[in-house]
Amino acid sequence: MNADIDLGCTVVASIHATDRDRGRDGAREIAGMYLANKVQNIQGSADTLLDLAGLEQDEIRPVAEAMERGGRLAAKEQVTDAILDKCKPIAGTPEDCIAAIEEYKDAGCTHVMLELWGADRQEQIRLFGERVLPYVRG
């Protein structure tokens, strides 16, 4: 039996039409929550995930501490650009998102599901549909 198998992954995503920082803001928020969870709750197996991403416990500990003190929005403020980049979100402007999806495709991913976060998710859905999908389908 010969079957095609899709290799899929769910990726943190957020987009803005023109402002890269605003487009990365939602991804920064969910990355903060995920990273805090890795530090606080998933010892052991999380170390492997962090190693693969090139993240150090000391690097993300401030994210977890901020989550404990002030919740997800406080944690978001501790997610630096360097940390966010290591998390490999599909985030930023439409052009940034196209480039990020191409990276996933080049790595062998054949099915990408987006976990949208941030402001105005309906607008984000529209932007992905109109300004990203036409360039990455195929």
Regions found by a protein language model. Give the residues of each.
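Active-site-adjacent structural elements that line small-molecule/cofactor binding pockets in enzymes
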Residues: 1-138
